């Protein structure tokens, strides 16, 4: 059976990266929530 997680750095960055988050209003909300929580890493 094929596993669900097939790692790809490019796909990871494009979907969950900082610039992807900044591109949308909701993505910016995600970043602000993570800043408020005090996360060391904001995005992938």
From Swiss-Prot:
Signal peptide: none annotated. Residues 10-19, 30-44 have a biased composition (Basic residues). GO terms for molecular function: structural constituent of ribosome. The keyword Ribonucleoprotein applies. Residues 1-44 are annotated as: Disordered. Keywords: Ribonucleoprotein, Ribosomal protein. Pfam families: Ribosomal_L34. GO terms for cellular component: ribonucleoprotein complex; ribosome. One of its GO terms (biological process) is translation. It comes from the Bacteria. Belongs to the bacterial ribosomal protein bL34 family. HAMAP family: Ribosomal_bL34. PANTHER family: LARGE RIBOSOMAL SUBUNIT PROTEIN BL34M (PTHR14503:SF4), MITOCHONDRIAL RIBOSOMAL PROTEIN 34 FAMILY MEMBER (PTHR14503). This is Large ribosomal subunit protein bL34. It comes from Saccharophagus degradans (strain 2-40 / ATCC 43961 / DSM 17024).
